[in-house]
Amino acid sequence: GKIRYVGLSNETPWGVLNFLQLSKDKKFPRMMSIQNPYSLLNRSYEVGLAEVSIRENIGCLAYSPLASGYLSGKYRNNSFPKGSRMDRDWDFWTRYRKPNTNEAVEHYYKISKKFNMISSAACD
């Protein structure tokens, strides 16, 4: 079969532009999407990648929109239920443990309650 559509994951703006140039030079299928983490706690996509995506017409497939559970409301106030993913794999979660994480999660939680929404709906 033929490759008709190409996408990248976890790439930088520089990498995306290099892939676009390579596909043009070699007459490869053009990249159509980029899959990167994106949530209210991780907005790094907005620094460079969003501009490249818009200008080059590349779709964004966001993953971890609820920050792997942080924005669901179940990890509020540094409470990590026994047997939860946070409890089982503490090192993995360092990407979300920042000085303002708990404060941000609490603000999002309060917004959801104010508008009678479940926490995850307020973070979509």
Whereabouts are the PLM-identified features?
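Beta/alpha (TIM)-barrel catalytic core signal, keyed to glycine-rich beta->alpha loops juxtaposed to Asp/Glu
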Residues: 1-124
